[in-house]
């Protein structure tokens, strides 16, 4: 039997790519599409909604969310309250919001996934970076995205930094008497190292973690050249959350 899926934010680039992926998988079925700016009533027989409250009672199992940070938490909370298992690629959640959603999902016995990045290569980069940081504690993260991205740093960069913090002993990087002659030149500070965000047209999603040591350096990099790179992770997430009873943060928990 097919897994019935709602896609919130289907008008966006990630949402529309997810719709195409679901249509092309015989194990998945589009149950509904949601976007506040939609003018259509249905697309190829799939009902279209502009208000999530109209989805209460809908026969669906999974809620895929590619919306915007300011509504993603509310959407995910709504999904869990109404029996939909969330698979969320929207970034910008606080740690408190993630913890709240984990608690709610456990109470409801519903699986779910919030993933800063759905590309398998990006998840591997995070894992490799955490491992390398034990031996190369001096590092900087540079994330590069298209110029329409609303949050900075990216969710991928934040998740990478959190994994590094768990693996690396704290170290304040850089000169003790370092001074910025231009405010912000050294980027954002996280656990003693720096994160830099680049926003340019033509980019999709890219990240480097650069490590330095005496006489050597190590650079780990992942590039998503097309949004199709995220769909294997979204597909995996949809099929995994229906078998689980609590939300997880990070695709690595499903690999």
UniProtKB/Swiss-Prot annotation:
Which Gene3D superfamilies does this entry report, sorted A to Z?
Dihydrodipicolinate Reductase, domain 2, NAD(P)-binding Rossmann-like Domain
Q: EC number(s) in its UniProt entry? A: 1.17.1.8
Q: Name one GO biological process term.
A: lysine biosynthetic process via diaminopimelate
**Subcellular localization, as worded in the UniProt entry:** Cytoplasm
Q: What is its main location?
A: cytoplasm
Quote the catalytic activity from the record. (S)-2,3,4,5-tetrahydrodipicolinate + NAD(+) + H2O = (2S,4S)-4-hydroxy-2,3,4,5-tetrahydrodipicolinate + NADH + H(+); (S)-2,3,4,5-tetrahydrodipicolinate + NADP(+) + H2O = (2S,4S)-4-hydroxy-2,3,4,5-tetrahydrodipicolinate + NADPH + H(+)
Hey, which pathway is this one from? Answer: Amino-acid biosynthesis; L-lysine biosynthesis via DAP pathway; (S)-tetrahydrodipicolinate from L-aspartate: step 4/4
What do the Gene Ontology cellular component annotations say?
Answer: cytosol
Chain positions recorded as NAD(+) binding sites: 9-14, 89-91, 115-118
InterPro entries per the UniProt record, alphabetical = DapB_C, DapB_N, DapB_N_CS, DHDPR_bac, NAD(P)-bd_dom_sf
Domain of life (superkingdom): Bacteria
Q: Sorted alphabetically, which keywords does the UniProt record give? A: Amino-acid biosynthesis, Cytoplasm, Diaminopimelate biosynthesis, Lysine biosynthesis, NAD, NADP, Oxidoreductase
- What is an example of a Pfam family matching this protein? DapB_C
Q: Which residues form the active site?
A: 145, 149
Enumerate the residues binding (S)-2,3,4,5-tetrahydrodipicolinate.
Answer: 146, 155-156
Which terms does the record give in the GO molecular function aspect?
4-hydroxy-tetrahydrodipicolinate reductase; NAD binding; NADP binding; oxidoreductase activity, acting on CH or CH2 groups, NAD or NADP as acceptor
What PANTHER family does its record include?
Answer: 4-HYDROXY-TETRAHYDRODIPICOLINATE REDUCTASE 1, CHLOROPLASTIC-RELATED, DIHYDRODIPICOLINATE REDUCTASE
Q: Which family does it belong to?
A: Belongs to the DapB family.
Outline what the protein does: Catalyzes the conversion of 4-hydroxy-tetrahydrodipicolinate (HTPA) to tetrahydrodipicolinate.
- For this entry, the protein name equals 4-hydroxy-tetrahydrodipicolinate reductase
Q: Which gene encodes it?
A: dapB
């Amino acid at each position: 039997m097919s897994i019935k899926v709602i896609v919130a934010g289907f008008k966006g680039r990630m949402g529309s790519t997810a719709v195409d992926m679901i249509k092309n998988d015989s194990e998945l079925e589009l149950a509904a599409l949601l976007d506040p700016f939609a003018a259509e009533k249905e697309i190829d027989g799939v009902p279209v909604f502009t208000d999530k409250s109209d989805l209460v009672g809908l026969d669906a199992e999974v809620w895929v969310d590619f919306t915007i940070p300011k509504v993603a938490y509310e959407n995910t909370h709504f999904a869990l309250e109404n029996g939909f298992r969330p698979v969320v690629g929207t970034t910008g959640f606080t740690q408190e919001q993630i913890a709240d959603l984990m608690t709610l999902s456990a109470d409801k016995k519903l699986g779910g996934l919030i993933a800063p990045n759905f590309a398998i290569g990006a998840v591997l980069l995070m894992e490799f970076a955490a491992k390398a940081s034990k031996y190369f504690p001096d590092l900087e993260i540079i994330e590069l995205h298209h110029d329409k991205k609303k949050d900075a740093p990216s969710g991928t960069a934040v998740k990478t930094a959190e994994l590094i913090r768990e693996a690396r002993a704290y170290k304040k990087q850089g000169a003790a008497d370092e001074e910025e002659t231009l405010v912000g030149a050294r980027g954002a500070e996280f656990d003693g190292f720096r994160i830099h965000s680049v926003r340019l047209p033509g980019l999709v999603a890219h990240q480097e973690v650069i490590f330095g040591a005496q006489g050597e350096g190590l650079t780990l990099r992942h590039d998503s050249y097309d949004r199709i790179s995220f769909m294997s992770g979204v597909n995996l997430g949809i099929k995994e959350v229906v078998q689980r009873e609590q939300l997880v943060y990070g695709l690595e928990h499903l690999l």
